């Protein structure tokens, strides 16, 4: 059988030893008492690795969970947040901002086009009072790749 390199967001290819490890029987972490000890120990080891005394948590979920976690961490009631919308994930930030009490301000473009740096610069000259901006580098549903090296310095 020919093995092709898979270059999509998922599923991803893994090394053979990882495939073998994943073939081992596993339990439901919600019901397995041993999992709690394993999880706690792993979080503590990550805290040591990061030289932090703060509590470390491992979030298990789809990639979009990271986007929501960022909004949950950064957004406070009434915060104005610039949501850069040129794809489904970009637009999705607006829902997360709203969910956590913020006021999303959408800066949208056609889903077939990356953001125009000059147009964004002109927009920000008129309205720039935002706590933070939400921008997706590669919005996979639309296939849009945003040039963060040029956009982020403006934000």
Write out the residue ranges for each language-model feature.
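Generic recognition of short, well-ordered alpha-helical segments
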Residues: 17, 95, 145-147
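Conserved beta-loop-alpha segment that forms the PLP phosphate-binding cup at the N-terminus of a helix
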Residues: 53-95
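Structural motif
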Residues: 84, 107, 135-136
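Active-site phosphate-binding strand-loop segment of PLP-dependent enzymes
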Residues: 115-155
């Amino acid at each position: 059988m020919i093995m092709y390199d898979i270059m999509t967001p998922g599923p991803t290819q893994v090394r053979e030893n990882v495939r073998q490890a994943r073939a081992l029987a596993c339990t439901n972490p919600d019901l397995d008492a041993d999992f709690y000890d394993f999880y706690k120990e792993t979080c503590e080891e990550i805290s040591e690795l990061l030289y932090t005394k703060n509590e470390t948590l491992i979030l298990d979920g789809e990639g979009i969970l990271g986007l929501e976690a960022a909004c949950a961490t950064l957004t406070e009631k009434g915060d104005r947040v610039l949501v850069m919308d040129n794809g489904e994930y970009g637009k999705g930030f607006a829902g997360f901002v709203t969910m956590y009490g913020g006021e999303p301000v959408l800066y949208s473009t056609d889903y077939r086009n990356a953001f125009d740096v000059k147009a964004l610069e002109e927009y920000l000259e008129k309205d720039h009072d935002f706590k933070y901006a939400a921008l997706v580098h590669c919005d996979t549903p639309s296939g849009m790749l945003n040039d963060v090296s040029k956009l982020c310095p403006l934000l």
